[in-house]
Amino acid sequence: MSSLSDLINFNLSDSTEKIIAEYIWVGGSGIDIRSKARTLPGPVSDPAKLPKWNYDGSSTNQAPGKDSEVILYPQAIFKDPFRRGNNILVICDVYTPAGEPLPTNKRYNAAKIFSHPDVAAEVPWYGIEQEYTLLQKDINWPLGWPIGGYPGKQGPYYCGIGADKAYGRDIVDAHYKACLFAGINISGINGEVMPGQWEFQVGPSVGISAGDEIWAARYILERITEIAGVVVSFDPKPIPGDWNGAGAHANFSTKSMRENGGYEVIKKAIEKLGLRHKEHIAAYGEGNERRLTGKHETADINVFSWGVANRGSSIRVGRDTEKDGKGYFEDRRPASNMDPYVVTSMIAETTILWKKP
């Protein structure tokens, strides 16, 4: 095994100019991540200089077998924390051979929204809080939980320390460091309310980069849990009953919100979000009705609300934002399995571009 370990950690840059590029894309379910690697003649830092590629879309539920070719368009580059050296991770979106975006390509429409002059002028910032649950392989049960049983009730696990409270910290810390190495703007991690559940935060990130970074961070997390023999779940309510669900809260601000008088801009934006509540809920993740019950720090899925420091509301405004008269707000509705391209662009579209009837 030592020879295998040596090869896994082998530094290619000592012997060749060639690099390995791992092309990453979203599969047919909208949450599954796929990837494959190719050799390139030398280092690349601009995604526009990377070659397009293709794959068998019939094996990812994205194309029929009789016309299975799907084209990968490179969009963002990150350093590869697994192969290191000059090797890279490449976030791609997917198109037909004729250049039409596939239905699962949510980046395409998001990029159009973020390139709109009115949106670009507002320099939208996002901070995404990605929650997830670590599961024991083969039994679909949270890490650290007794098989067929339950741990003690919630209370000591949030930001908890100790072998009886924090399950999987090595995975979480490895992911944190790997994301920093990759160039992802990861800003923190913490243990969550339900044991076996964790959160990482990405941001502040501007526009489309928030979605690119979340997908890259999810990919790295999937790879690390693969190595650890643990399964990561983005299900918004993995365990029924008196246990917290998993969300992906989206913190958002525009240039106008961050300037003096921004609190009034925030309140107008929240009013718009309330008027389009149903449209947002429909796009905020599958199975979210199991999570947004009005309990466990959530709002009822059918009722829009907002408040200052209220974690039981749809939209939360921080005390500092209220006091300073400017800042940001938090949309607490997105589920952990949301598509970050959809959520970030929809918030920008509603608050900046959409006009009240």
Swiss-Prot record:
Disulfide bonds: none
Catalytic activity, as annotated: L-glutamate + NH4(+) + ATP = L-glutamine + ADP + phosphate + H(+)
Pfam family for this entry, one: Gln-synt_C
GS beta-grasp domain mapped to chain residues: 19-99
Coiled coil: none
Origin: domain of life: Eukaryota
InterPro entries: Gln_synt_N (IPR008147), Gln_synt_N_sf (IPR036651), Gln_synth/guanido_kin_cat_dom (IPR014746), Gln_synth_cat_dom (IPR008146), Gln_synth_gly_rich_site (IPR027303), Gln_synth_N_conserv_site (IPR027302), Glutamine_Synthetase (IPR050292)
Enzyme Commission numbers on file: 6.3.1.2
Enzyme class: ligase
Principal cellular location given in the protein's record: cytoplasm
One of the GO biological process terms: glutamine biosynthetic process
Keyword Ligase on entry: yes
Keywords in alphabetical order: ATP-binding, Cytoplasm, Ligase, Nitrogen fixation, Nucleotide-binding
GO MF term set: ATP binding; glutamine synthetase activity
Misc. comment: In pea there are distinct isozymes in leaves, roots and nodules. Irreversibly inhibited by the herbicide L-phosphinothricin (PPT).
Oligomer status and interactors: Homooctamer.
Family to which the UniProt record says this protein belongs: Belongs to the glutamine synthetase family.
Name of the molecule in the record: Glutamine synthetase root isozyme A
Gene: GS3A
